[in-house]
Amino acid sequence: MKTSLRTLSVALAAALVSPSVLAIEKIDFHGYMRAGVGVSSDGGLAEWQKTMVGRLGNESDTYGEIGLGAEVYKKEDVSFYLDSMVSMLSDGSNDSETTIGDDAQFGLRQLNLQIKGLIPGDKEAVIWGGKRYYQRHDLHIIDTKYWNISGSGAGIENYTVGPGAVSVAWVRGDANDVDTRITGDSDVNINYIDVRYAGFKPWAGSWTEVGIDYAMPNPTKQQKEYGGLYDADNAVMLTGEISQDMFGGYNKLVLQYANKGLAQNMISQGGGWYDMWHKTDEAKGYRVINTGLIPITDKFSFNHVLTWGSANDITEYTDKTNLISLVGRAQYQFTQYVRAIGEVGGFYQKDTYHNGSNYKQGGEKYTIALGLAEGPDFLSRPELRVFASYLNDSENGKPFEDGTSNDTWNFGVQVEAWW
């Protein structure tokens, strides 16, 4: 026994002083968090349609992402970088929140290897494999990503071609619990091919990116025999965007088209997930997004997101769905650390069905807040904010107070940070 322990100790010591460990000069620590406390007119904080009316004063969760990364090998132009990230989500209701009873949910979000310096002709191009957030395109004030093909995969990114760079990836994004009538075999494997070209500048101050995502459901033999929802077609999503420097900020225009199982993203504020839960053989959708961040003065800045989307036949019952959403957030910096924030958002969505009926959704949110953060940068974090919000369902959906009210208010304190 003593000999075994001595052998193990020697092995551990040798591992700790090995060249591969000593090569790690620093660990990169990065992440995101939001947390807070608040009340509404009906108990705890209400959260309603935040991707449509805005997130400020309209979030009720505690969420965090903790990432660790390190360059584990470096020789001349060749670099091997390992990255990892875990996430945690809870409702913030108790002191001790564990996985018991789903008080808290933990997830493995990223675990990948990124290699530079091995592609001839471009030492900055990256070969990668593993699980990662893949080039996500974010709309921060409504907490959604309009282009988001993330998951386990592999690819080559940022390979210089002409004035820009090409990225090609294969990413897995399965659909779960599609049809539980097939016992133990209701998850469908879906593979995406993602191709992007970014960096072409047609004029001074501009920047463009275009891409295509091709989703391929890959059912098992049993699922193919069963048919139905498992008999899903391959789908495509096209994205093109152009950004323009403007008054020290920017404005961006995004145009998107999607069909089949990807079409519903155009009216759901989604970023590329495949809908296996509805019949989508004839589905088509379009989306236009305009967003920008403009520092109007040294102390006053404004961020907006305007979304218009339209889709046909996204379910076997739905003829057409139209969506329009507009959210604006203004910020005024009183002192280096004190700011006033206001956010207003509204949306309207109409689903028209093949039987001639329709379903309407719509509403507004108004928020005022006092924030503490180093200014005047609009996105400077960490930030602590005290807020009050009013939320209203203008289409009589009664989403509040146990289905009895069309409106409610929130009051609370929230902190947000990324690093």
Swiss-Prot record:
GO cellular component: cell outer membrane; pore complex
Known catalytic reactions: beta-maltose(in) = beta-maltose(out)
Induction / repression: By maltose.
InterPro entries to which the protein is assigned, alphabetical: G_neg_Bact_CarbUptk_Porin, Maltoporin, Porin_LamB, Porin_LamB_sf
Gene3D superfamilies according to UniProt: Porin, LamB type
Domain of life: Bacteria
Site (Greasy slide, important in sugar transport): 32, 63, 250, 418
Localization annotation: Cell outer membrane
Sorted UniProt keywords: Cell outer membrane, Ion transport, Membrane, Porin, Signal, Sugar transport, Transmembrane, Transmembrane beta strand, Transport
Signal sequence region: 1-23
Gene Ontology annotations of biological process type: monoatomic ion transport; polysaccharide transport
Membrane topology: Multi-pass membrane protein
Molecular function GO labels: carbohydrate transmembrane transporter activity; maltodextrin transmembrane transporter activity; maltose transporting porin activity; porin activity
NCBIfam families assigned: PRK09360.1, PRK12395.1
The family this protein is said to belong to: Belongs to the porin LamB (TC 1.B.3) family.
Self-association state and partner proteins as the record states: Homotrimer formed of three 18-stranded antiparallel beta-barrels, containing three independent channels.
Protein name in the entry: Maltoporin 2
Gene name in the database record: lamB2
